[in-house]
């Protein structure tokens, strides 16, 4: 049996904007190789074979990395379950049913899921676990996210990730308010989440703790999409050989 030191990745969504960036960034990793791609159009000038359907692939790999759309989920899960392969999900906008399917499938194969593959965002997310406990009583919490005008889901998966982290780490029940309109007064136990779409903004997230006489802002700005590509490639390398279960950026950063 051959032992491969390289991490061989099958990239789903390889012809998309992020897929192209991941392919470019992979050349800077000595231990990673993209050996095949999957995309709705198999026409490309990439250095590896591209298949329109993942089940058509005859190329062996160690990890399947998905940067496509939620509609691809069922075929990816079917393929990875059959091949016993780790699945790295970088797509956002999943329905509750799809999230339940991911959770259930992780009992049989290793699945890595993160709403944002940036290491910086995930460090901030980790900090929020402690900060929220100390500030929630005396500070109003608002989250503002900004993205390019081509992003279809809102609020962003990252904004929800940050909000969920705050909500899960305070004893009181917090409600999400998406945008604000009308004349109702802000209640105490809520997190305001606001989405802005315009131009070519890569990704901007601002968590605001507004108190009496002071305001704390924790902000992350993605300057280039390469930050997401690098995180996705590192996550793929991390997942090689992992046992079944759910994994996220915290697992990787703390390993």
Curated annotation (Swiss-Prot):
It is found in: Cytoplasm. GO terms for molecular function: 4-hydroxy-tetrahydrodipicolinate reductase; NAD binding; NADP binding; oxidoreductase activity, acting on CH or CH2 groups, NAD or NADP as acceptor. PANTHER family: 4-HYDROXY-TETRAHYDRODIPICOLINATE REDUCTASE (PTHR20836:SF7), DIHYDRODIPICOLINATE REDUCTASE (PTHR20836). (S)-2,3,4,5-tetrahydrodipicolinate binds at residues 148, 157-158. GO terms for biological process: diaminopimelate biosynthetic process; lysine biosynthetic process via diaminopimelate. Transmembrane segments: none annotated. HAMAP family: DapB. The keyword Calcium does not apply. One of its GO terms (cellular component) is cytosol. Signal peptide: none annotated. It comes from the Bacteria. It catalyses: (S)-2,3,4,5-tetrahydrodipicolinate + NAD(+) + H2O = (2S,4S)-4-hydroxy-2,3,4,5-tetrahydrodipicolinate + NADH + H(+); (S)-2,3,4,5-tetrahydrodipicolinate + NADP(+) + H2O = (2S,4S)-4-hydroxy-2,3,4,5-tetrahydrodipicolinate + NADPH + H(+). Belongs to the DapB family. Its EC number is 1.17.1.8. It comes from Clostridium tetani (strain Massachusetts / E88). This is 4-hydroxy-tetrahydrodipicolinate reductase.
